[in-house]
Amino acid sequence: MERWRDRLALVTGASGGIGAAVARALVQQGLKVVGCARTVGNIEELAAECKSAGYPGTLIPYRCDLSNEEDILSMFSAVRSQHSGVDICINNAGLARPDTLLSGSTSGWKEMFNVNVLALSICTREACQSMRERKVDDGHIININSMCGHRVPPPAETHFYSATKYAVTALTEGLRQELREARSHIRATCISPGVVETQFAFKLHDKDPEKAAATYEHMKCLKPEDVAEAVIYVLSTPPHVQIGDIQMRPTEQVT
C-alpha cells in the first residue's frame, strides 16, 4: 500500500456502514480520502476520530447528492481544484427500496437506478477522466457490488435491486474492456459481499423493523470491516494484477 500513500481516494456513501469502514481503512493507510454523502455529520465525526487516533491520512467530508448529476460534477470539480484529482474511486453508495416488479412504484425503481447505476457510472467516468488527464496510469475503480449482482434471491422486494446490481457487474467488466482497449493500466474491480450487518435492511424494511432485524439474527454476518479489508487487499496487489471480482459471504449464508 506504500505507493498509495498521500494519494487521493473518493469514497461515495461514506456516512456509515461499508463506506465509513472503507474510508477509515484508507486513512489508516495514509491516503487522503474524500468521503461523500447527502449528509456529512457522521463523516465529520469519523474525520475527527481518525485525526485524534493519529492515523497518517486525512478524511475530507463532502456533501453530495448522488442522484443529482450537477452535484457529482461539482464535487469532481472541487476535488480537481483543491486536490489535483482522483487516483482511486470507490463507488460504494447504493440503496434498495421494497418495490417489486409486479406492483412497485416507478419512483422507487428510478431512485434505485439513479444511485446504483447512473451515479456509479458518472463517478466512474469523471474519475477516469481525472486520472487520464493527469497521466495517472495506475488508478483504480472499485465498485462495491453485491451477491445480488450474481444471482437473484427469492424475496420479491429485492428483484429490481438485483437488476441494478447485475448492471454493476456488467459495467465493471465493460469498463475493464474499454480501459484495456485504450491501452490504459487503470484497473476495475467489483467487490460483491453477501449479507453485511449494516443499516441496509432497516432502510429496506423501514416499516417493519422486526423483519429488518431478522435479516442479521439467523447467522454471523459479515462486518463492514471485512469488506474494507477486501478493498485494501485489492489495492495492495501489483499494478499488473487485475482482480475482476471478489465474491464474499458469511460462512453460514445459504446463497
UniProtKB/Swiss-Prot annotation:
The active site is at Y161 (proton acceptor). Belongs to the short-chain dehydrogenases/reductases (SDR) family. It is found in: Secreted. Its EC number is 1.1.1.270, 1.1.1.62. PANTHER family: DEHYDROGENASE/REDUCTASE SDR FAMILY MEMBER 11, DEHYDROGENASE_REDUCTASE SDR FAMILY MEMBER 11. Pathway: Steroid biosynthesis; estrogen biosynthesis. Residues 1-25 form the signal peptide. GO terms for cellular component: extracellular region. Disulfide bonds: none annotated. NADP(+) binds at residues 13-18, 38-39, 44, 65-66, 92, 161, 165, 196-199, 203. Inhibited by flavonoids including apigenin, luteolin, genistein, kaempferol and quercetin and also by carbenoxolone, zearalenone, glycyrrhetinic, curcumin and flufenamic acid. The keyword Transmembrane helix does not apply. Catalyzes the conversion of the 17-keto group of estrone, 4- and 5-androstenes and 5-alpha-androstanes into their 17-beta-hydroxyl metabolites and the conversion of the 3-keto group of 3-, 3,17- and 3,20- diketosteroids into their 3-hydroxyl metabolites. Exhibits reductive 3-beta-hydroxysteroid dehydrogenase activity toward 5-beta-androstanes, 5-beta-pregnanes, 4-pregnenes and bile acids. May also reduce endogenous and exogenous alpha-dicarbonyl compounds and xenobiotic alicyclic ketones. GO terms for molecular function: 3-beta-hydroxysteroid 3-dehydrogenase (NADP+) activity; estradiol 17-beta-dehydrogenase [NAD(P)+] activity; nucleotide binding. Keywords: Lipid metabolism, NADP, Nucleotide-binding, Oxidoreductase, Secreted, Signal, Steroid metabolism. CDD domains: Mgc4172-like_SDR_c. InterPro entries: NAD(P)-bd_dom_sf (IPR036291), SDR_fam (IPR002347). Its main location: secreted. Substrate binds at S146, Y161. It is an enzyme of class 1 (oxidoreductase). It catalyses: a 3beta-hydroxysteroid + NADP(+) = a 3-oxosteroid + NADPH + H(+); 17beta-estradiol + NAD(+) = estrone + NADH + H(+); 17beta-estradiol + NADP(+) = estrone + NADPH + H(+). GO terms for biological process: estrogen biosynthetic process. This is Dehydrogenase/reductase SDR family member 11.
